[in-house]
């Protein structure tokens, strides 16, 4: 059982206030929890209590936050949350994956609603990365408008047999990062994967 009495209040509060509310619903306590993996990776023991790490990539940390919200410009609803946000001389956005990369998931088809399809950021990302959506499939409303865009991994030059990476979440996070940073800011978006040595 995870002992929160030895964990600093700011870490506990981040998960209590996060959209997943993973402490109260018990998800955090699973050995397969990405959130728990994030805390284990970005905290250190000081005076018998877990605190946020103070250095990252050789630099002192100005700010670190778990469950960091990334509001996307012109998108309503609950914003996507990055597992960890770190501010040094650059901004680092970290998405943590534990068991997800070993799951046979349903991510092979990427469905995006009209609020994403019509968002200028989404269009810029498609153009910048030369993602060809000419052979895309759409779900149409009664007036013939595309209300849900369906993309596949092939649009991103990812092998169809690869079904364990959530490209929809990746696109939403990327849009959130672009919405919350300026072009001249130094930033990076990284993934932290759990490597099970028993799995090829």
Predicted features by range, described:
Residues 1-15, 25, 80-82, 100-102, ...:
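ER/Golgi luminal nucleotide-sugar-dependent glycosyltransferases, focusing on the catalytic module
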């Amino acid at each position: 059982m995870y002992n929160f009495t030895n964990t600093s209040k700011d870490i506990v509060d981040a998960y209590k206030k996060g959209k997943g509310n993973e402490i109260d619903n018990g998800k955090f306590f699973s050995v397969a929890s990405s959130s728990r993996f994030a805390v284990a990776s970005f905290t250190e023991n000081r005076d018998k209590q877990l605190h946020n790490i103070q250095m990252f990539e050789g630099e002192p940390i100005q700010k670190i936050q778990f469950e960091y919200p990334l509001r996307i410009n012109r998108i309503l609803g609950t914003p996507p949350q990055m597992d960890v946000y770190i501010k040094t001389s650059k901004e680092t956005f970290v998405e943590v994956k534990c068991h997800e990369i070993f799951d046979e998931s349903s991510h092979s088809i990427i469905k995006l609603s009209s609020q994403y399809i019509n968002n200028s950021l989404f269009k810029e990302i498609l153009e910048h990365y030369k993602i060809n959506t000419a052979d895309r499939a759409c779900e149409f409303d009664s007036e013939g408008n595309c209300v849900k865009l369906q993309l596949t991994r092939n649009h991103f030059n990812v092998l169809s047999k690869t079904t364990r990476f959530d490209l929809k979440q990746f696109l939403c996070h990327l849009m959130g990062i672009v919405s919350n940073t300026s072009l001249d800011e130094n930033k990076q978006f990284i993934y932290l994967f759990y490597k099970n040595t028993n799995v090829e």
